[in-house]
C-alpha cells in the first residue's frame, strides 16, 4: 500500500510533463507573424512563418492585375454538417472578395508575395466597422501562398466580428476573445484550372495557365 502511495507523485509528475510537452509542441508549430507588410484602417497584410508547410516557391513576382484576375475567380461556401449541408448547397457560393476589397488589399498581397521566404505565407485582413463600431471590427481574413505552378488560398474568417479592445480579453462580462477560424469550401472558375496540388493533396489554382487565358500577353 505504501509503495503505491509513493508512486502516485511520480505518476503525477510524469503526466504533468507529458501535458506540458504536448502543449509546448502544439504552440511551437502554430504559424506566427514574422513581419508586417502594410497596416492601416482598411487592410493588414503580414508574413507568417508556417512550420508545417512544405516549402513554397517564394518570392514570387506578380502584378496587381494578375493577382486580381486570379482572386476574382474564387468563391466559397461555409462548410456545414448534414442536414445543414443540403440547404447550404442550394445557395450560390459567395465571392471571396468584393471589388472595393480587392482594390484595397491586392497591391499589398503582391508586395507580400515578392518579399515572402519559402517558409512564409502572406496573411491578410480586410477591415470595416463592425455591427457595434465602438467595440467590434468586421474582418475578412485568410492567407495566400504559391508553390509553382499552384496558388493556394485559404479563407479563415468572412465578415466576422472581431473585438477592438484587447485589454478586455479577460473581462468575463465583455470578453474580447476573437472568434475561432471557420472551415470554408473554396471553388474556382473556370473549373479546369482548379486542381489538386500533388505535394500537399490540397486544391489550388493553376494560376500560370489561367493567366494565359485571362490577361492578354501585352498586359502581363
Language-model features: locations:
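A mature extracytoplasmic/lumenal domain signature
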Residues: 49, 126-130, 140, 150, ...
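Envelope-exposed proteins and targeting segments
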Residues: 120, 138-142, 147-151, 168-170, ...
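Early exported N-terminus immediately downstream of N-terminal targeting peptides
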Residues: 47-103
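Sec/Tat-exported extracytoplasmic proteins
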Residues: 71-78, 109-120, 155
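Sec-dependent bacterial lipoprotein signal peptides
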Residues: 1-25
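Bacterial Sec signal peptide processing site at the extreme N-terminus
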Residues: 19-45
Amino acid at each position: 500500500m505504501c509503495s503505491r502511495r509513493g508512486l502516485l507523485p511520480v505518476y503525477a509528475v510524469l503526466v504533468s510533463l507529458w501535458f506540458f510537452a504536448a502543449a509546448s509542441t502544439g504552440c511551437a508549430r502554430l504559424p506566427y507573424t514574422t513581419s508586417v507588410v502594410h497596416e492601416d484602417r482598411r487592410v493588414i497584410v503580414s508574413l507568417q512563418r508556417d512550420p508545417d508547410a512544405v516549402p513554397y516557391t517564394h518570392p514570387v513576382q506578380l502584378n496587381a492585375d494578375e493577382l486580381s484576375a486570379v482572386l476574382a475567380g474564387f468563391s466559397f461556401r461555409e462548410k456545414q454538417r448534414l442536414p445543414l449541408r443540403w440547404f447550404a448547397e442550394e445557395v450560390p457560393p459567395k465571392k471571396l472578395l468584393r471589388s472595393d476589397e480587392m482594390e484595397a488589399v491586392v497591391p499589398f498581397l503582391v508586395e507580400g508575395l515578392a518579399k515572402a521566404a519559402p517558409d512564409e505565407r502572406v496573411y491578410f485582413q480586410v477591415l470595416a466597422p463592425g455591427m457595434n463600431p465602438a467595440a467590434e471590427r468586421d474582418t475578412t481574413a485568410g492567407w495566400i501562398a504559391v508553390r509553382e505552378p499552384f496558388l493556394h488560398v485559404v479563407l479563415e474568417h468572412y465578415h466576422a466580428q472581431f473585438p477592438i479592445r484587447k485589454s478586455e480579453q479577460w473581462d468575463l462580462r465583455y470578453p474580447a476573445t476573437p472568434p475561432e477560424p471557420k472551415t470554408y469550401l473554396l471553388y474556382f472558375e473556370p473549373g479546369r484550372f482548379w486542381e489538386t496540388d500533388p505535394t500537399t493533396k490540397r486544391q489550388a489554382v493553376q494560376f500560370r495557365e489561367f493567366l494565359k487565358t485571362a490577361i492578354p500577353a501585352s498586359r502581363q
